[in-house]
Amino acid sequence: MNITTQDKFEEMEIEKTLGLVRGSTIRTKNIGYDLIASLRTIVGGEIPEYTKMMDESREEALKRMYREAQRRGADAVVGVRFETSSILAGSAEFLCYGTAVKLKNNIQLNFK
């Protein structure tokens, strides 16, 4: 399935718009990560534990959006966006959304 942040594919024409698809996950911080993060704020630098959690969360939200698009019979998802928002103290929602479409002359370009 092709996925892009653009509103269309230069190489292909959209035949039918199937509607909004989304995927999300809510994650909470780990008390061990908080301790490490607190120490890192003293010396500065990246907090790799949180970076990994953020990457995994975005990937999970993307996979869930992808699966919803597949269930709808989409060939592609255009206009893909990511958002993050705080839900409760210490937890955040990672959201990925876009527009599922059917393409004329579907050619697979990128995402597997």
From Swiss-Prot:
Disulfide bonds: none annotated. SUPFAM superfamilies: YbjQ-like. It comes from the Archaea. Belongs to the UPF0145 family. This is UPF0145 protein MmarC6_1828. It comes from Methanococcus maripaludis (strain C6 / ATCC BAA-1332).
